[in-house]
Structure formats: structure tokens, C-alpha cells
């Protein structure tokens, strides 16, 4: 049943839904981890100024890697007219990395991928995206840099990861670096995501949300 407005008249569910549409965007983001990506994205969500909460909404969900697109498609279908669907994941050891990205794009879902891992994007907050081929080496090198910059050990379960990166790093510079690295890959003929090292697309998600805050 609908709710009553101030005049006592009943409102339909459709009318109620229209009133709740976030005018600056509703971002439905599905990731395949319980730690780094999820904590980072929830930190981004928590950074939304109080006066914009309700107008700019970020919902982060978890799914198995193979079900990322399916889960995102199902969740975003609840708000098809204004939802911005994203899947966020690493190349890491994902077998069908390029296939997942292609599947997402074919379903109108943005793919915020990172190659070799999310830490290559986090590294950019410190002014650099070094050439590192595997995720283990990338995580270890980022952990060393993170400790040097913050004085704290890097922990994938760190809830304040986004906040700390913004405090000791430079997000605007990180976005520029990511754009430059992606451009370099393309200029070098590396057009397939699994071949684009180092590279990421998550900067596009961050930049889009930043512009609305």
C-alpha cells in the first residue's frame, strides 16, 4: 500500500519511488572481495558531504568473480532509469578477465578493472604507477610505500583506507597518472585490458563521483 501525504491522500508506490530518486546519481557497485576494494569504496561513500547524502548514493555489494556481472545486472535492474552500475575487480588470477569486462560492457555495466591489482591504483595516490606485472609484487611494493608515507603497516582490512590515502596522497594527481598510463598503453598498441600493465579504469569511477561532490 502507498503512504499518505500531508493532505491525507494515499500516494502510489511509484510516486514514493520518484521522490527518493538521488538527483546526483545512484551508484551500484559490485566487487569480488570483502576487504581492499570493498573498504576503499565504502570509504569513498563515507566521504560524501552530509548535505549531499540522499542526493548522491553509493551502494557496495559483494559477489563471486564469476557472478559479478549477473549480480550487478540484477541489483541495478531495481532502478533502471537512474542507476549507474559498476563492477570492480582485479586481473590478479582471474581466468577470464577480458571476458568479464566484455560481458559487463555488453550489458551496459561499467568495468572498474585494475591490472595487475587495485594496489596499482592506490599507488598512484603517491605520485607513481610503476610497471609491476604480478599482484603479489604489486601489493608488497605498495605496502612498503604505504608504510613509508603513513607510518603504519598496510592492512587490506583497513576501514579508513580511502580517508588515509586522501590525507597523505593526492587523488587528483592519481587520476591524471592513471589516465596517462592508460593512454601510453593504447599508444603502444596494448588494447586488451589483460595486456595493459600498469593500468586501471577505476579512476573514471572516482573522477565521476568527485565531480558531483
Model-derived regions: residue spans:
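Short N-terminal edge-element motif at the start of the domain
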Residues: 65-80
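Short glycine-centered, acidic/aromatic-flanked micro-motifs in structured strand/loop junctions
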Residues: 31, 89-91
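C-terminal accessory helical subdomains adjacent to catalytic cores in phosphodiester-
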Residues: 2-6, 12-24, 38, 42-59, ...
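Short amphipathic beta-strand starts and helix->beta connectors
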Residues: 11-15, 69-72
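Catalytic nucleophile-elbow at a beta strand-turn-alpha helix junction centered on a G-D-S/GDSL motif
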Residues: 26-38
